[in-house]
Amino acid sequence: MAAAEQVENWLSSRGFRTFPFHDGRVRYVALPAMPPTSVAANAYFFSIDSDLVYWNFFLDFGPLNLGQLYRFCAKLNAALASPKLRGRTIYFYSGTHPHRRTNAAALLSSWAIIFLNQTPEEAYAPFRGATPGFTPFHDATPIACSYNLTVYDCLCGLYKAKNLKFFDFDTFNVDEYEHYEQVENGDLNWHQEGKWLAFAGPHENSEMTRDGYQTLTVDDYGPYFQQKGVTLVVRLNKKYYDERKFLKYGIRVLDLYYLDGSNPPRAILDQFLREVEGNAGGIAVHCKAGLGRTGTCIGCYLMKHFKFTAAEVIGWFRICRPGTIIGPQQHYMAEMEQVMWREGDLYRQRKANEDKEEARPGDKEVVEGMLGSLETLALGAKATAPEAKRSKRHSAKQAADVESSTAAEEAAEEEGKMTQGDELRAMRARNMHGGGGGGMGIRRK
């Protein structure tokens, strides 16, 4: 009997089902412990359960982040390329806990998408019909989650991001990723390399907050942003720093504050989309923790311009930056999906029409164009007054909303209450340096 068959017989006789990948050269199995040496010697078994650890905020347990996915893929690829393991089946195994199984399935299927160039359907096919099924991922809250984000959702988001070249593991700098995700180094992650960056909000001074979070200043971020081509910072939270300090780095700041933990009012989302659509450089977005409001606004842009589904956005963003998009924001994304798709179609149609009109007109068209312009100016003069009034009313309402939201947040702070952003920052600080033990990156032995 061949060695591979002996291992399979041993596993199946004990009720352990294996899931084949790469024509059976790679298999996944959930095991309570490593098989005995007499069995394991006939194959190659490896696990990442104790090496790649997801440090949760609350009840969330995955998916593992982009740096951890990279390290998993590197480990598996090294085993496949090893001359010592030629001809031997490679078993990737995890513990039997539902969270372990779900994260393992996400890792291996993601590897198949990235390195076998498979579609989400192909990459997830070996796991179809797995019993028990895989537990949906939970958002970064301490209460029951009413939005089911599946392994397959994450795969679809990863697949779309890969095809759009939002990341490239051939050039991915895992050390840089793990460095800048640390609180003291920036607490930042790229959702689209070179274009969209999410980070925790800077403060006027660098200090340790009452919740144990190390704040950073504009000067901590400025040089890195300048190096990476960031030209716009969007601030979605209350003002904690002088935005003029970003100017010396060639970066302007757009203020679009709304209440922590909530969904963007339509006027704010519209202004966000208009501003970023006209920005040529990289865009860094922050709220308090850089997770909820930040992910929601960037996600709407991706739905509008790249036709991501809401689930694809959430899945991809949580791989990039764990904990992104929280609670009601998940359902808001689902509600905005079709809206953003329609607006994206109209945007692209309008741009296409504008491109056609840029062709130089003939003499007749020039004259007609001049006459039309004069008519437009005349009509515009009549319409200026009421239009200005509407704009003024809109600005006044937005200012009143900001003032109301700021007052509510300041009142909560005075009472010693923590907002969603405060709680997330506190848990992140704990994970990086305290009770969690090893951060969201690699825990090395």
What do these predicted ranges mean?
Residues 2-111, 116-283, 300-338, 342:
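Cysteine-based protein phosphatase catalytic domain of the PTP/DSP
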Residues 9, 13, 125, 230, ...:
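Polar/charged alpha-helical tracts
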